[in-house]
Design a protein with these regions (language model features):
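Exposed, flexible binding/inhibitory loops of compact, secreted disulfide-stabilized domains
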Residues: 1-72
Length: 72
């Protein structure tokens, strides 16, 4: 079993900024992150406040365009 990092690698998802968030894009990022959790956040996406350092969060605007990324 692979050893997993304690925090996400944002470099993996940096290319998504400016793109429309789609289920396919989320799966693509998840695959690039070796199965690490990935989710969209923003006005169109309900989300919880739980903190998961390995998770990549793609924060979107009202048009579902990714405007920033962060771990958590």
């Amino acid at each position: 079993m692979p050893v997993l990092p304690d925090q996400c690698d944002l470099a993996i998802a940096r290319y998504t900024i400016g793109q429309k968030c789609t289920p396919e894009l989320l799966e693509e990022v998840r695959a690039l992150a070796n199965g690490a959790p990935v989710r969209a956040t923003g006005p169109k996406y309900p989300s919880s406040w739980d903190l998961r350092p390995r998770r990549i969060n793609l924060h979107t605007d009202a048009n579902r365009i990714i405007v920033s990324i962060h771990c958590g």
